[in-house]
C-alpha cells in the first residue's frame, strides 16, 4: 500500500438525504467513494466493486455498455487523516466513472439513479441558461432546493414523506388512546 494517495475528504451533499463521499487529491482531481456511490444509486455496498470486476473480466452483464461509454473501472485507494476515526483508507472512483455508473443505474431503472440524473440535469441546465442570459448562477442553497424538488418529484419522495407523516400521526393517536 505504498502507492496510496493522501486526500482531503468532504461530504458532497446534493440535498438532505442524497450525498456521496468526495475526495480531493493533491493534484486537484476529485474522486468519489465507491461505497457511497453504491448507496446513493440504490444498490448494496459492494455493487461498484462487483461492477468493476465484471467490466475487468468482460463477463459482467453491462461490461460492453460501460466500456463503450468510456468507463475505466479504475478504483484508487486514498488515505484520509485527521478524521474522528484517525487515518482511514477509502476506495474511490473518478467523476467520469461515477457519471457512467449513474447512467447505468438509471438505464436499469433504479429510481434513486433516475432521480439523481434528473436533478443534476435540472440544476446544471438552468445554470447554463442563466450564464447564457448574463444572469447569476444559482446559489448553493438554490441548487440544493432545486435539486431536492427535482429528485423528490422523480421518485415521489413527497408522497412517501406524506405517508410517513400519516403513519406517525396514526401511531401518536394510538399511543394517546384516540385510535377509535
Feature roles, as predicted:
Residues 1-49, 54-180:
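Positively charged, aromatic-accented nucleic-acid-binding surfaces
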